[in-house]
Amino acid sequence: MAIDKITTASITSGVLPVNTPCFFASSSADQTINNNTTTKLTFSNEVYDVGGVYNNSTYRFTPGFSGKSNISAGLWTYDAQSSFFRVDLWLYKNNSMIVSTQQRYTSSNTTVERQSSSFNVTVQHDADDYYEVFGLLRTVDSGSAEILVGSGNNAIFDNYFHAHKIIE
């Protein structure tokens, strides 16, 4: 267990392990996803980025250390025509899918207007591995759908990408 590594000396010296680097990024603008098209999700609003591990122009997390990190992401989608029947949210590591969440309805007669998906996973990585989040939406009418954000500093973080170091 990790707790056995915290000693009396480390507590009295004030030197405790920290779970940084870490970051939290959210969507800063609405994003359109075309029907049945794998799309990289754009999280350009860095709420915090301790250690400079997130690039808000490539939307990539590169840990900068070898070890383990906890990674999570959330996606909230909207289709005004209420025609979603599939929503996928994926985590890619070095351009290969490693996590897949899928919400599918068995009949095209069963559709929704709004859909939320998320994942939370602990991964082992090298310092130069990189992670990205992708999504795929399917609609009955083959139309595009939106990933919507709020406005200003009061925006709700429905669309986000987050990671922090796991202390071992």
Task: Pin down the residues of each PLM region.
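Short, low-complexity N-terminal tether/leader segments at secretion or assembly junctions of large
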Residues: 1-17, 164
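Extracellular jelly-roll beta-sandwich "head" domains, especially the C-terminal globular C1q domain
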Residues: 16-168
